[in-house]
């Protein structure tokens, strides 16, 4: 429940099929928010829109950009105000088809210990470290697999640097307790 309730308030709507729903639970505590640097990983040109989370992902061209910017500032200038900073809509109690979970008080959401994306990023990072700060074709394919799943653009003509991989870790694992 913490990951769902702490990152939402009653003004956030993560489900376009049910505009009255917030996060699929009956709790929205309005606490944790994204730092500007994280949001800008999805908008490197700095032009970050103030949209609902599902629309932000579409604007970023990356399904992982689940940030609510409606009536919020990008910067976290006042840490005691939830509208100071973008809300994070990464975790919900909605099923993949958009329907609600079984219980709004006790979420159905499972918490993962290891994801395929972690293995792919570990492989790509090791590949780049072995090959002078640039992925080979195999390392590039590993990152492209993650980005294709997120409907984000991929690279075919050149590989990824360690800096690119670090940014990819951020985009994939934010709010999951993993390193950047």
PLM-predicted stretches and their roles:
Residues 5-8, 151-158, 166-180:
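C-terminal capping/lid segments that line or modulate ligand- or cofactor-binding pockets
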Residues 1-2, 62, 110-146, 162-176:
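Extended, hydrophobic/aromatic-rich amphipathic alpha-helical segments that build helical scaffolds
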Residues 64, 72, 83, 95, ...:
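Surface-exposed charge patches in extracellular/virion surface proteins
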């Amino acid at each position: 429940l913490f990951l769902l309730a702490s990152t939402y308030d009653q003004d956030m709507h993560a489900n376009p099929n049910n505009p009255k729903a917030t996060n699929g639970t009956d709790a929205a505590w309005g606490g944790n928010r994204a730092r500007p640097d994280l949001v800008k990983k999805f908008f490197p040109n700095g032009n970050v829109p103030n949209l609902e989370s599902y629309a932000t992902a579409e604007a970023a061209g990356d399904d992982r950009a689940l940030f609510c910017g409606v009536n919020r500032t990008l910067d976290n200038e006042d840490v005691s105000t939830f509208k100071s900073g973008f809300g994070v809509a990464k975790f919900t109690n909605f099923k993949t088809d958009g329907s609600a979970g079984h219980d709004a008080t006790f979420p159905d959401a499972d918490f993962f210990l290891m994801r395929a994306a972690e293995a792919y990023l570990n492989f790509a990072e090791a590949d780049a470290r072995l090959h002078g700060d640039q992925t080979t074709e195999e390392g590039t394919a590993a990152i492209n697999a993650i980005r294709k799943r997120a409907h984000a653009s991929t690279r075919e003509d050149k590989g990824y640097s360690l800096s690119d991989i670090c940014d990819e870790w951020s985009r994939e694992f934010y709010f999951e307790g993993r390193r950047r």
